[in-house]
């Protein structure tokens, strides 16, 4: 490499010497996923050849109920009868958050839904329309994320403009509702707020 110091202008050849791998706190790392599947194999005796199926099934289930530790999962893993999804989810928390795990498999979940023509279960309840229903899951941000696992054949199709817009709108509505529920006070002590919470204005206002 011709560049000798950090202040020396690098050539394109110099830059290509860097083998960068994208990573972010919002998506589980491959090492964390490997640690999770190792825990599953040791704890639940899941064969190595079905561990990927267990990951995909669990992430797909979270797309229906929300990627949160508070979400209620039902049923056994489609990968192995007798092992519940709830048990597998509990083991994830040792290594990363549920959201981080799901974000890693967002592209796989997206392809599963498109291939089976089955959108997330709560899309209508969350306010999505027919044309954007496949975006109706809370880790949709992981689709096309550089740190998320990409299927070998790529995506069946990328998200449409309508789907991207619908998801961003749903996120803003969720944030607004949360802020309205909590109020705008920075300090929540009763001595400061007198037990009151400042009102939050509407997300959309109309001219009089």
Swiss-Prot record:
InterPro entries: Pltvir_coat. It is found in: Virion. Keywords: Capsid protein, Helical capsid protein, Ribonucleoprotein, Virion. Pfam families: Flexi_CP. One of its GO terms (molecular function) is structural molecule activity. GO terms for cellular component: helical viral capsid; ribonucleoprotein complex. Required for genome encapsidation. Forms ribonucleoprotein complexes along with TGB1 helicase and viral RNA. Belongs to the potexvirus capsid protein family. This is Coat protein. It comes from White clover mosaic virus (strain O) (WCMV).
